[in-house]
């Protein structure tokens, strides 16, 4: 399993958070869900940061079966539509966005 994580590192002014969060949870999640080959998309919002941790506001995790599937999705016409939807809400965000790609190598359920 391949996981492409988009980190939004920064802040959103308190007055803008409800609209920003609603845009990310609604239109952005719906747009991302249209990527070809996507198995799952999850949105993680910071519950608490530890001392010294970067100020990550939220993370989108996109799950694909393979790097080839991820690359095909990112090369598709869908990507431009997703980017446009994301950009509509980004005026409220102060910071940077970066991506990391992980391969899931182990998993176990807690007893």
Task: Please annotate each region the language model reported.
Residues 1-10:
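Active-site-flanking beta-strand signature of metal-NTP-handling nucleotidyl enzymes
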Residues 14-20, 68-72:
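Short, conserved charged micro-motifs
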Residues 21-25, 75:
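Amphipathic, non-transmembrane alpha-helical scaffold segments
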Residues 24, 32-33:
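Hydrophobic C-terminal alpha-helix "anchor/cap" residues
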Residues 33-39, 53-55, 63-100, 111:
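An amphipathic, aromatic/His-enriched active-site/gating alpha helix that lines ligand/cofactor pockets
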Residues 45-47, 101-104:
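A general secondary-structure junction signal
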Residues 47-59:
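Charged, often glycine-rich, active-site loop that binds/positions anionic groups
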């Amino acid at each position: 399993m391949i996981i492409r994580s988009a980190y939004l590192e920064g802040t959103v002014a308190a007055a803008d958070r409800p609209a920003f969060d609603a845009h990310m949870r609604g239109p952005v999640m719906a747009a991302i869900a249209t990527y070809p080959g996507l198995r799952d998309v999850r949105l993680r919002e910071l519950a608490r940061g530890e001392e010294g941790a970067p100020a990550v506001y939220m993370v989108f995790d996109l799950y694909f079966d393979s790097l080839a599937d991820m690359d095909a999705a990112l090369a598709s016409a869908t990507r431009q539509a997703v980017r446009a939807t994301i950009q509509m809400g980004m005026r409220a965000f102060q910071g940077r966005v970066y991506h990391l790609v992980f391969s899931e190598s182990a998993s176990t359920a807690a007893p």
